[in-house]
Amino acid sequence: MLAGYFYGFYTGQNSYIRDYLYISWILWAYLVSEEQRKAQEDVAVENKDNHTIYDQLEGKDCQVITFNYTSYASQTSPTALYFHGSLKEYVDVENKNDFLHDDLTTIDLEDFFKNQLAAEISFDPDHKSIPIPSFLPPLKLRPVISKHYIDTWYHASQMVLRASKIIILGYSFSSADNYFCDMLRENHDAQIIIIDKNMETASRNVCRCLQLEANRYTKQIKDGHEIRKYNNRVTIIGADLLDVNLDDV
C-alpha cells in the first residue's frame, strides 16, 4: 500500500502524498506503541528465561545491518545500520532535512501529532514541508529521500564486502531488495549462514538472490534442525530464531 502512494512524490499528486502521509504516520504510531508496550512488559518481567536474538547480539564483537524499523538493533549495537530506515528518524522530503526522536519509549504520541507534526506539515506552494517517517516502502527502485540513505547504503556495502562471515537472521530476500543481493554477490569469499524457520521458501529465495542452483545442496540434520549447504560456503539452517544460540553458529 505504501509503495502505491509513494509514487505521488514522483508525480507531484498532492492527493497521493496526503494519503501516504496519513498511512505512513499511522503505521509509525502503531509500531512505536508496540515498542512502548514491550518496554513496559520487559520492566515487569525482571528475569526472562527466553532471550531474543537482540539480547544475544548485545556485547558481541560484530557489525549489524537491520531491515527492521524498530529501535531494538540500535539498543543492542549503537553502530547498527538501518537499511530501510528507522522509527527513530523522520525526514522532510521536500527540503531534505533529517530529524531524530530522542526516545521512542517516552514519546507522547498524541502530543507529538497535535503539537509538533501538525505544525511541521505544509502544502503551501511558497513554503512546502512534507515530513514523513524515515522508513522506505518495498520498492525495487531505491528512492533517495535523504543523503542519510546514501551514506547508510555505502557503509552497508563496505561492511558486507569486507566481511569474512555473514549471518542472516529471518530475512526474506525479497525481490525488492535486489540492491542488497548485489552486495552479497560481490563478496565471493565470506561464509554465509542463513537462519530461517521456513526452509523451502528461504532456500528458493536465497538461491535466486545468490544465483545458486536450487537443487545442488548437501542435507544434514543437527539438533533436530535441517541444514542445507550450497557451494561449500552458503549454509541454510531451518530453525526458529528463538531456538538459535548464536554462540554455536
Which stretches of residues belong to each language-model region?
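Extended, H/D-rich, highly charged conserved domains that either
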Residues: 1-140, 144
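SIR2/sirtuin-family catalytic core signature
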Residues: 60-62, 143, 148-249
